[in-house]
UniProtKB/Swiss-Prot annotation:
Component of the large ribosomal subunit (LSU). Mature yeast ribosomes consist of a small (40S) and a large (60S) subunit. The 40S small subunit contains 1 molecule of ribosomal RNA (18S rRNA) and at least 33 different proteins. The large 60S subunit contains 3 rRNA molecules (25S, 5.8S and 5S rRNA) and at least 46 different proteins. eL39 interacts with yih1. This is Large ribosomal subunit protein eL39. PANTHER family: LARGE RIBOSOMAL SUBUNIT PROTEIN EL39, RIBOSOMAL PROTEIN L39E. The keyword Cytoplasm applies. It comes from Schizosaccharomyces pombe (strain 972 / ATCC 24843). Belongs to the eukaryotic ribosomal protein eL39 family. One of its GO terms (cellular component) is preribosome.
Length: 51
C-alpha cells in the first residue's frame, strides 16, 4: 500500500477500520438479544480487503 493514497482508497480503508471492531457490551444486555459477537471481524494478516 503506497503512502500516497487516492481519496477513494482512503475512504475504503477508513470504512473497513470502522467495521472491524467488537460489538458494544450494552447490546449484549438487551432483552431477547441473539447477537453474541461480531461475526464479520477481520484480521489484517489472515484476510485481505482486495482493494
Amino acid at each position: 500500500m503506497p503512502s500516497h493514497k487516492s481519496f477513494r482508497t482512503k475512504q475504503k480503508l477508513a470504512k473497513a477500520a470502522r467495521q472491524n471492531r467488537p460489538i458494544p457490551q450494552w447490546i449484549r444486555l438487551r432483552t431477547g438479544n441473539t447477537v453474541h459477537y461480531n461475526m464479520k471481524r477481520r484480521h489484517w494478516r489472515r484476510t485481505k480487503l482486495n482493494i
